[in-house]
């Protein structure tokens, strides 16, 4: 286990993945780029995210926020600590129909958001081919 993993295990409740196989799964997205991350944290709370940011700052490590990994330009791969928001940090926090405002967590899938908005005659107007996976 790496030093970074040891520190994070004492500071977060989320799932940590530092084995080579798991890191390899996060080394690619829909682009041609391949970059092995240092490790992966699936945060379970805002406290996990804050702690991960603190540890990254203390250790001089970059952070990479990731959801569905559907980028075709390589934005979701890097030699960094990956925060995978797709597992626990998804969903709608607030839907304010009067003001046509929606607050979501970063891991929500675009199609799921639009399914929730459709009964209200609304949709989030981003039309991508990966909407069933894109966050």
Per-region residue spans from a language model:
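Conserved PLP cofactor-binding pocket of PLP-dependent enzymes
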Residues: 66
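N-terminal glycine-rich flavin-associated loop
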Residues: 8, 31-63, 85-130
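A glycine-rich phosphate-binding loop feature that marks nucleotide/adenosyl-phosphate handling sites
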Residues: 22, 72-73, 131-135
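Conserved oxyanion/phosphate-binding beta-strand-loop segments in alpha/beta enzyme cores
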Residues: 6-27
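Intrinsic disorder at enzyme termini
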Residues: 1-5
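Short glycine-aspartate micro-motif
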Residues: 82
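Short acidic, glycine/serine/threonine-rich loops at helix termini
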Residues: 74-79, 114-116
């Amino acid at each position: 286990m790496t030093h970074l993993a040891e520190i994070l295990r004492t500071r977060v409740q989320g799932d940590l993945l530092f084995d080579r196989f798991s890191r390899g799964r996060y080394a690619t997205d829909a682009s041609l780029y391949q970059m092995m991350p240092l490790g992966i944290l699936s945060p379970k709370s805002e406290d996990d995210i804050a702690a991960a940011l603190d540890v990254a700052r203390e250790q001089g490590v970059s952070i990479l926020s990731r959801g569905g990994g559907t980028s075709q330009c390589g934005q979701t791969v890097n030699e960094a600590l990956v925060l995978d928001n797709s597992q626990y940090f998804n969903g709608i926090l607030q839907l304010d129909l009067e003001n046509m405002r929606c607050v979501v967590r970063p891991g929500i899938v675009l199609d799921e958001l639009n399914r929730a908005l459709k009964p209200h005659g609304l949709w989030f107007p981003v039309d991508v081919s990966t909407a069933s996976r894109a966050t």
